[in-house]
UniProtKB/Swiss-Prot annotation:
Cytoplasmic face residues: 1-126
Keyword Membrane among record annotations: yes
Protein name: Mitochondrial fission 1 protein
InterPro entries documented for this protein: Fis1, Fis1_cytosol, Fis1_TPR_C, Fis1_TPR_N, TPR-like_helical_dom_sf
Native source organism of the sequence: Mycosarcoma maydis (Corn smut fungus)
Single biological process term from Gene Ontology: peroxisome fission
Gene: FIS1
Length: 152
């Protein structure tokens, strides 16, 4: 089975496409038995969403599948990693993607996602450094102001 590259997976489903997956999932849930494929399909659609709450539900469903259905773990690893990446949980994204790369070192999809994760980590680091720099500047100004008052 060929899985999409990370850039392809960033594309969201239309609301009507996601609704089809949700309806199937809810119908099976109401009957008392949700197939793994239906749960996976719905989770996949949710992870592709642009809404964090939907991504989070998708990651939760994928985690359930990952824990309960070992033959489906390979498929889950990529989408768990993607979901965590999209939500900014870079440590979790790295962890799941590393497991996939460990199993399949030549997996171009996982390598592509790994590049996105590393860019996200770097971007987060730059933002953190900017915030620290800004806080240091504000603190310096405040200290200078206090020192001037103390001299008067």
């Amino acid at each position: 089975m060929s899985l999409p590259y990370a850039a392809d997976a960033e594309t969201s489903l239309s609301p009507s496409e996601l609704q089809v997956l949700k309806s199937q999932y809810e119908t099976e849930l109401a009957s008392g038995h949700v197939t793994t494929q239906t749960k996976f399909n719905y989770a996949w659609g949710l992870v592709k969403s642009k809404q964090r709450a939907e991504m989070s539900i998708g990651v939760g469903l994928l985690t359930e599948i990952y824990r309960s259905d070992p033959p489906r773990r390979r498929e889950c690893l990529y989408y768990l990693s993607l979901g965590h990446y999209k939500m900014g949980n870079y440590d979790e994204a790295r962890r799941f993607n590393a497991l996939l790369i460990e199993r399949e070192p030549n997996n171009l999809q996982a390598q592509s996602l790994n590049q996105l994760i590393e860019k996200g980590v770097a971007r987060e680091g730059y933002i953190g450094m900017a915030l620290i720099g800004g806080a240091a500047a504000v603190a310096s100004i405040a200290i200078a102001g206090l020192m001037r008052r103390g001299r008067r």
